């Protein structure tokens, strides 16, 4: 059909909208997108119908765009693949910002396909029209404003624009944003566009991207053998932040070969014989002992422990190496350092092959004894059901291959202070470290991993993302949400906020519990009254292919008082 014949048809614009959407999605598929998250909307009809027509895409839906963004974030986090997101125009787009900001800091690859009014309807009083141009600003790796589909622009431009942004994302990570202007009509019959598509006929006949990018040099791990072997003869520490699943094993082997202490953040996916360092580093003798180290090798970023960050910032470190696959600055202490961008597991394996016996192997073994004595002290906190006893005991409750999601605010800090976590895939949103979107993120991880999962979060976090429980109604593996309900923001009990305004303006007690929320979404619910009962209910829930909420109710302020008492005891104890 000729272009003149096409434009004479009443609804050709609707068909052209869908054609452009189909071209975009097909090229995204060829560039590695397998899953797409869609919220309802009329302006996004072309993208939605194109997704349905593409049998290489798995579709996930949610009625709330903020939750949808975090759902996609969870899928991308767990699969380590790009995930597409489709929303309609207006504030639907703005609701993606929290998830986009998180991905901007932690590197998950989101492909945002936002629908927009045509440019002539922006800032003129038209309905559901806001300024969406570059709305995510510096939080995204690339932004492209896709004009209203027109036969005057070759489909080759559209495909090559997709390829350019996706190639940039492959190198830098984070979200990329295509803002797509769709004029009405949005609904119509198919039209023959064969003449218009002639310039990309070869592309249509294969399954390759329109533009194939190749690096001149294949990426490889390069470590200066002489420099590394000199470094390994020092007193060093191996610090581990956020890791991808299955990377901890290689890092642990390297630390063992070096004979250096291994300090693991909760996001690392396990614990070591030096666990509890966030607390025992408050003991002056222990702190002084660790400060003998003049070398730090850090794998992964986003460290939770303030005490560990203070050690990095203030100790007399001569050599600080930070290895992470993501680009950008990841050292908030601004130390002079060697910043290595590389896959962590591969780099650790390469370093291990170059590592000889270290002169100072085992130098920090006394700190293992410190850790043992510290955990003996925690025994007195294990007889009652409290947030502290939950954090102390949780690791022992989890069957093999049960994965973890750790919420923000108080709970992840408690696990860092007193927990011993099992070796398992462990996830968290520790970029912006917000309490929003945690349930939706858990749902996304669950969809990608298809493994039993326990998510731990606080009551305010659950209230913040309550409607995302809808995403957990239909699961194929056990999902257990353990919510610690201390009636508000318990983290503020540990911060020097004004005492007179602590409740009213910081903790904000709500007086709510979650049994009715569980019932509303058809989820199982337990509220244990003792620590053994909590363990029993958790273990049972992990045998059921459904979602269970376990609510741990504790008095407001209790956790803060217990932590302060523990800190005082450890500071004054003889641990070395």
From Swiss-Prot:
Biological process, per Gene Ontology: menaquinone biosynthetic process
EC class: transferase
Cofactor binding remark: Binds 1 thiamine pyrophosphate per subunit.
Cofactor(s) needed by this chain: Mg(2+); Mn(2+); thiamine diphosphate
Pathway where this protein functions: Quinol/quinone metabolism; 1,4-dihydroxy-2-naphthoate biosynthesis; 1,4-dihydroxy-2-naphthoate from chorismate: step 2/7; Quinol/quinone metabolism; menaquinone biosynthesis
CDD domains for this protein: TPP_PYR_MenD, TPP_SHCHC_synthase
UniProt GO molecular function: 2-succinyl-5-enolpyruvyl-6-hydroxy-3-cyclohexene-1-carboxylic-acid synthase activity; magnesium ion binding; manganese ion binding; thiamine pyrophosphate binding
Enzyme Commission code: 2.2.1.9
Catalytic reaction equation(s): isochorismate + 2-oxoglutarate + H(+) = 5-enolpyruvoyl-6-hydroxy-2-succinyl-cyclohex-3-ene-1-carboxylate + CO2
Keywords: Magnesium, Manganese, Menaquinone biosynthesis, Metal-binding, Thiamine pyrophosphate, Transferase
Function: Catalyzes the thiamine diphosphate-dependent decarboxylation of 2-oxoglutarate and the subsequent addition of the resulting succinic semialdehyde-thiamine pyrophosphate anion to isochorismate to yield 2-succinyl-5-enolpyruvyl-6-hydroxy-3-cyclohexene-1-carboxylate (SEPHCHC).
HAMAP family: MenD
PANTHER family on file: 2-SUCCINYL-5-ENOLPYRUVYL-6-HYDROXY-3-CYCLOHEXENE-1-CARBOXYLATE SYNTHASE, PROTEIN PHYLLO, CHLOROPLASTIC
Similarity-based family: Belongs to the TPP enzyme family. MenD subfamily.
Subunit structure as annotated in this protein's UniProt entry: Homodimer.
Entry protein name: 2-succinyl-5-enolpyruvyl-6-hydroxy-3-cyclohexene-1-carboxylate synthase
Gene: menD
